[in-house]
Amino acid sequence: PRLKRGFIEIRPEDVKGLEKFASTIKGALKLGRRISTVFVDLAVVGSVAVDLRGNRLGKGGGYGDIEIDLIMRENPRVIIATNIHPIQIVEKVPVSEHDKKVDLIITPDRAIWTEWGRIRHQIG
């Protein structure tokens, strides 16, 4: 929700012994440093449900879609993953034009490349 002010970088060496506090919004704001851009190779986003085509349902508000869009602007080849329980994989997720897809679904037992992810990353 604080995307208007940019991303916050939290480096492990800067929060030794304060990891739990640093994982909160208040802690991140106090211990982290603001950065204007972010370049990552793998982004893990939350989902309420996903389908095997790569469509995801977030919590509403579009914040996950905004985060994915900002990350992909810096690295178009970033892998967008979501970690979920297998019961959250559904037949079809309703989508709208602004919704962003995930490349990879991670469950406790396996990793599944979505149709979108296989096409985008040219995986057989």
Segments and roles (model prediction):
Residues 1-9:
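An anion-binding catalytic pocket shared by soluble metabolic enzymes
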Residues 9-124:
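Surface-exposed, charge/polar-rich loops and edge strands
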